[in-house]
C-alpha cells in the first residue's frame, strides 16, 4: 500500500503537523522504523526514541517538539492505529477450494468459502458465507460456523459445536474435546461421558493452542466479542460473558461463570464452580478460589523481586508462621 501523510490524517480525522505529501508505504516502530514508514506513540516510555527515529510519520495524542518526523495528532492513538493497521493488512486471496480438501457431500458451504489442502469438513457441517478454512483444519460432523469466520491451520472443531459470525480461531486450537470428568470407583478413576457441546457467539477470537472443552451435560458457552489469547484452558460447563478478554496461559476449571466485560491477566488460575461478576479484572498470575461479587481490580501472588530480597522475605514469612 502506498499513500501519504495527508491522506492518512484525513482518513483518521487527525491534525497534521508537517508536509502532507510525505510518502508512506509501510508501518514500523519508533526504534526500528525506516524512511517511508509510519508508527505510533501510545506509551510515554517510548518517547525517548522520537529524536533519533527514522520514521517518516508518527501518530501522537499531542504535539512532540522533539520529533523530527511528520506528526498526526489524534484523540485516541490506539484506535487510530487499529484503523491504520487494517488499511495496511494485505487482502485475502480470492476464494478457492483445494482439490486436496475432504468435504463430505452432505456438508453445506456458503458462497465465497475457501478451504485449504488437507482440511476435513464432516457430514452435515454448515460453513457460512465467506468463511476461510485453512489447510489441515478439521471440522467435525454437524458443526455450524457463521459467515466471514476464519479457521486456522490445524484447528479441531468437534461435534456439537456452534460458532457465530466473524469468528477468528487461530492455529491448533481445539474446541469441543471431552471435558475432564472422572469418578473414583473401586480404587480407580472411571471417565464420565461428556454429553454437552460448545456454543460460541459472534466476533470471538480464540488464540493458538487454546482448548475449550465441551460441557458435561449443558454446553460450554463463549459470549459475543470474547477475546481469548494463546494457550488457554477452558474446562467443561464454563460460561464466559460478552466482551470478556483473557490473556495467555490462563486456566479456568469447570463450571466457572464469568460476567460481561471481565479482564483476566496472563497465567491466572480459577477454581471450579465459582462465579465472577461483570467488570472484574485480575492481574497476571492471580489465583481465584472464591466467587467475586464486586467489580474492580483483584491481585494475588508476589511480583518478581531480586533473589536475595525474596530469600529474606520468605525467611521472615517462615518465622512469622512459627510465631503463630
Sequence positions of predicted segments:
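Terminal amphipathic alpha-helical/low-complexity segments used for targeting or macromolecular assembly
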Residues: 1-100, 112, 161, 166, ...
